[in-house]
């Protein structure tokens, strides 16, 4: 079960960490239903709003629907024969459910898989090369260029 956790204290009236959060949602998931293999209902009636500037975490037990929710938002359900069959997902005023995952990533939405740790003492480039040790150098160089094109700040790390 996924539930939205609301803070127990109101943000400070004089500004503070939450002062820059805009009240209008940047991401809105509205009453979605997700089905796998056309018959397995995984999520039903899930709704949540993510305000601009907010940091949100989905917490729950194994099988609660966290990964499925993130796959629905990032457009990756099709890779596992899943689909949003009801409701809608809106990002910055535009519907994105059922859309192209590449376009979704270009909007700045992506899923970070759990349990994938980088080696902190290595640069981003060294971590990328480490994960590609079985591939040819030309392929790796091309793919690393593409990663840096999508995420230019990684070059700095």
Task: Give, region by region, the residue ranges found by the protein language model.
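The feature captures the beta-strand-to-loop junction immediately N-terminal to the Walker
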Residues: 59-64
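Helix-to-loop junction immediately C-terminal to a conserved catalytic motif
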Residues: 74
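Conserved ABC transporter NBD signature motif
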Residues: 84-94, 107, 140-146
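Short beta-strand immediately N-terminal to the Walker A/P-loop
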Residues: 56-57, 111
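ABC-type ATPase nucleotide-binding domains, specifically the catalytic core motifs of the NBD
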Residues: 37-38, 56, 77-80, 124-142, ...
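Short coil-to-beta microelement around the adenine-binding A-loop and adjacent beta1/P-loop entry
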Residues: 39-41, 103
